């Protein structure tokens, strides 16, 4: 007689084995109707799962994160079923759940079109309305191979052949469609009411470019139409804010096939980049970092000593000279240890904070490249802190405080914190790990922030904290990190003389705030839709004359503002003032200063913002004060200008 313990601690007893659905129905008809799956002793199962022993059970519905994932997985199967009904001969491969949706890869004789996508989605809606039961069955590996061979599903056969022979396999069927899957799935297709196909793209079998090309159809699915509508709205907003489109429109940068994954910065984009770099340089100087510069091309022997050659060789750009192998550095850390190693250090020299705007290159797969967000050539705001074990907490706390200040200046206030702790395979003693993990935890608690613990997710050489930004669309971008490293300093011979005159190996803290400049600038472009805070704007002020009579005044005003350190464009073209205002507004220049005869008479300017707000006429000195206050404020108030 199974006794079911529910999440609220209550118990329900049954005289005989029951399914998850039976339990939901016993609780209430509404819950039975809403049930998508169950969680039995922490494991997700179908609603048809039979419970024979005492069990802890949670009923999973569309309100649960697990429930939404199950809806997405089931919708992927629904899409595959629709594709095979509409396009006989289409072979299915894999169809996983991804963030906010799902995809399925197909092999078909021709590319799917937008018209095909509309037909597929319509057929999915029809199949969902049929409320087809979804059932689970078990087969042996040999039975499954025989079945899918008979069905002509070559790719499924290949997948099954890679599974150990003694393992029984689970399959899910709805109507005439059957697919290999661990599950669980919704009990019937009628549970799938809110989905949308979003795009079709190319893909390669097993993600290998040397294999045959497939077609990948992406979709999104949600528990209800309200959530779907909200997500599609966010997608539209993200499309409007796409940094690649805005970058092209504003003339910030471009990329081309002759240099895949590398950025061609244009003058305005480089101005933005330089402003970010100079700001970071000043912040690091203020917080006690010493800036260095290390080589970009380094011998294979150093990468072998550091351990990177064995682990990351395939991701490095390599070359050969005079019978020696070299690699363009994919990261800066081994080079920073070389700087530390020049001259014996004392405990009095620690902590030593070495920072570099390090130019790195990684041979990312071409299919993974995405504008500024995923590149092959990038610059990191990289720094390494060499310190004693007892200084870890203090250094981490100081870093977090600096990171908060920097993110606030860029306009980000919502930060997510994740602490990753020791994995099974690791270097260093448990005592050292205990001490380091406690130091990171105490540093987070000292800041009074909420943080998430990720047990076992640390690197083999030390625990870490990751810092992620949440943008205006609710998207999360992992940017900052601080990582304790017990391994590399020892591997590369770093030592210092301790206060007892013994030689010891320092702890090294890897840290970054922005991550890569390229990616962070991409995030800024999308966050502000190109309308950057005044301190970052490539052009901060456009000075516009109405007629040629104001030319000299405008030129002198522009020179005055330029000499005060502002980025100014004096637009003296023989164009109508309305045309010039519109053009600079579209270019998202924060302040438009208009000069006519009246302004000259009063040594004044008429000021407008890019949002169309008329700030009226004011003296040049007052405008400079307004401009200075706005620049000083940075991104700490997101009041748009």
From Swiss-Prot:
Chain segments annotated as transmembrane: none
Region (Catalytic): 242-533
Annotated TGS domain residues: 1-61
First-level EC class: ligase
Family to which this protein belongs: Belongs to the class-II aminoacyl-tRNA synthetase family.
Protein name (database record): Threonine--tRNA ligase
E.C. no: 6.1.1.3
Catalytic reaction annotation: tRNA(Thr) + L-threonine + ATP = L-threonyl-tRNA(Thr) + AMP + diphosphate + H(+)
Keywords: Aminoacyl-tRNA synthetase, ATP-binding, Cytoplasm, Ligase, Metal-binding, Nucleotide-binding, Protein biosynthesis, RNA-binding, tRNA-binding, Zinc
Biological role: Catalyzes the attachment of threonine to tRNA(Thr) in a two-step reaction: L-threonine is first activated by ATP to form Thr-AMP and then transferred to the acceptor end of tRNA(Thr). Also edits incorrectly charged L-seryl-tRNA(Thr).
Quaternary structure and interacting proteins, as annotated: Homodimer.
GO cellular component: cytosol
């Amino acid at each position: 007689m199974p006794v079911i313990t529910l999440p609220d601690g209550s118990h329900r007893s049954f005289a005989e084995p029951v399914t998850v659905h039976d339990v939901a129905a016993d609780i209430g008809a509404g819950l039975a109707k809403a049930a998508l799956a169950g969680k039995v002793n922490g494991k997700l199962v179908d609603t048809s799962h039979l419970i024979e022993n005492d069990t802890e059970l949670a009923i999973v519905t569309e309100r649960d994160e697990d429930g939404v994932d199950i809806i997405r997985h089931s919708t992927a199967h629904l899409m595959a079923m629709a594709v095979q009904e509409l396009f006989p001969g289409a072979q299915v491969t894999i169809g996983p759940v991804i963030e906010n949706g799902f995809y399925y890869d197909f092999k078909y004789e021709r590319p799917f079109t937008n018209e095909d996508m509309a037909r597929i989605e319509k057929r999915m809606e029809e199949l969902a309305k049929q409320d087809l039961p979804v059932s689970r069955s078990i087969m042996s590996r040999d039975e499954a191979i025989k079945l899918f061979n008979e069905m002509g599903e070559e790719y499924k056969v290949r997948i099954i052949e890679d599974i150990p022979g003694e393992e029984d396999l689970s399959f899910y069927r709805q109507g005439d469609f059957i697919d290999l899957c661990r599950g669980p799935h919704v009990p019937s297709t009628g549970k799938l009411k809110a989905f949308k196909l979003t795009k079709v793209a190319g893909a390669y079998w097993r993600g290998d470019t040397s294999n045959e090309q497939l077609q990948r159809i992406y979709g999104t699915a949600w528990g209800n139409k309200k959530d779907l509508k909200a997500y599609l709205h966010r997608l539209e907003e993200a499309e409007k804010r796409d940094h690649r489109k805005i970058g092209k429109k504003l003339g910030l940068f471009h990329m081309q096939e002759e240099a895949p994954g590398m950025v061609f910065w244009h003058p305005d984009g480089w101005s933005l980049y330089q402003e970010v770099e100079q700001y970071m340089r000043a912040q690091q100087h203020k917080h006690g970092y010493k800036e260095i510069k290390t080589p970009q091309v380094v011998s294979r022997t150093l990468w072998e000593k550091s351990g990177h050659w064995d682990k990351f060789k395939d991701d490095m750009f390599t070359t050969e000279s005079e019978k020696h192998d070299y690699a363009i550095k994919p990261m800066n850390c081994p080079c920073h240890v070389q700087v530390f190693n020049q001259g014996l250090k004392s405990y009095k020299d620690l902590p030593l904070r070495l920072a570099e705007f390090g130019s790195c290159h990684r041979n990312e797969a071409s299919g993974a490249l995405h504008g500024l967000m995923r590149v092959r050539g990038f610059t990191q705001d990289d720094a390494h802190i060499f310190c004693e074990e007892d200084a870890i907490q203090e250094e981490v706390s100081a870093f977090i405080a600096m990171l908060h200040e920097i993110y606030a200046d860029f306009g980000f206030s919502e930060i997510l914190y994740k602490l990753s702790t020791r994995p099974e395979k690791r270097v260093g003693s448990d005592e050292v790990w205990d001490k380091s993990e406690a130091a990171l935890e105490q540093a987070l608690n000292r800041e009074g922030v909420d943080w998430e613990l990720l047990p076992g997710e640390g690197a083999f050489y030390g625990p870490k904290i990751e810092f992620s930004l949440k943008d205006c669309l609710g998207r999360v971008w992992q940017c900052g990190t601080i990582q304790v490293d017990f391994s590399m300093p020892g591997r590369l011979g770093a030592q210092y003389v301790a206060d007892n005159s013994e030689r010891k190996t320092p702890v090294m803290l890897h840290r970054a705030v922005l991550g890569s400049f390229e990616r962070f600038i991409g995030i800024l472009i999308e966050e502000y839709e190109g309308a950057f805070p005044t301190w970052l704007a490539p052009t901060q002020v456009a000075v516009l004359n109405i007629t040629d009579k104001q030319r000299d005044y405008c030129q002198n005003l522009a020179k005055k503002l330029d000499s005060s350190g502002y980025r100014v464009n004096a637009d003296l073209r023989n164009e109508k003032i309305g045309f010039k205002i519109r053009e600079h507004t579209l270019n998202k220049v924060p302040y438009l200063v208009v000069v006519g005869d009246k302004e000259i008479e009063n040594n004044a300017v008429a000021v407008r913002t890019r949002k169309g707000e008329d700030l009226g006429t004011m003296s040049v000195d007052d405008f400079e004060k307004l401009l200075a206050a706005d620049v000083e404020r940075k991104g700490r108030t997101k009041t748009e200008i």
